[in-house]
A protein has these predicted regions:
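Primarily ABC-family ATPase nucleotide-binding module
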Residues: 1-4
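ABC transporter nucleotide-binding domains
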Residues: 6, 13-196
Length: 196
């Protein structure tokens, strides 16, 4: 059995003015080496849960642990091991592919030879090598998706949160992403993929 890397105990979140909780008390353990699906209709709380796991939103009750770190109390430690790709891929459309990668590398303090090797690996992995000078805003939906994934992987996370990564992209691009993500899981990464 794989090592458990995310554990949730009674995790809840409510928003003011809402009759029902955004996330009802949730208990689960998620293991590395798998792609775990977080499936539900729009408004079910998938993005809210992802944001709590990424330390971007504080839970109202219960607790979460990601690789032993509390997402709020240990945000610096969590940032070093977690990659989060939001629904819109988190890209700067007025920057080129390479400028987006450089920005994310700067944010993750990836420098020098490690940066060069990481970029070479990610550009090959995503097949974006020929497009490094293209503005992100001029990429197709599938290419934006791949760039978003590459930017998320710059820091070599152990946990990858993908919030609705297949929305707005063609079936071939979704299949390619699915294959890339399964390869990462096969290498021991924990992947949580939300979808409707």
């Amino acid at each position: 059995m794989s090592e458990a890397v995310i554990t949730l105990h009674g995790l809840t979140k409510r928003f003011a003015g809402m009759d029902k909780p955004a996330v009802a008390p949730l208990d689960c353990t998620i293991h590395s080496g798998y792609v775990t699906g977080l499936v539900g209709p729009d408004g079910a709380g998938k993005t809210t849960l992802m944001r709590m796991l990424a330390g971007l939103l504080k839970a109202d009750g219960g607790n979460a642990s990601v690789l032993g770190f509390d997402p709020i109390q240990n945000d610096s430690e969590l940032h070093a091991v977690l990659g989060y790709m939001p629904q819109k891929f988190g890209l700067y459309e007025d920057l080129t592919v390479m400028e987006n990668l450089n920005l994310y590398a700067d944010l993750r303090s990836v420098t020098g030879e490690i940066r060069e090797k990481t970029f070479a690996r990610l550009l090959e992995f995503t097949a974006l090598g020929p497009f490094t000078g293209r503005l992100a805003g001029k990429l197709s939906g599938g290419m934006k998706q791949k760039l978003g994934l590459a930017c998320t992987l710059v820091g070599e996370p152990k946990v990858l949160l993908l919030d609705e990564p297949g929305v707005g992209v063609d079936p071939i691009s979704r299949r390619e992403l699915w294959q890339m993500v399964h390869e990462l899981a096969g290498d021991g990464m924990l992947i949580l993929w939300s979808t409707s």
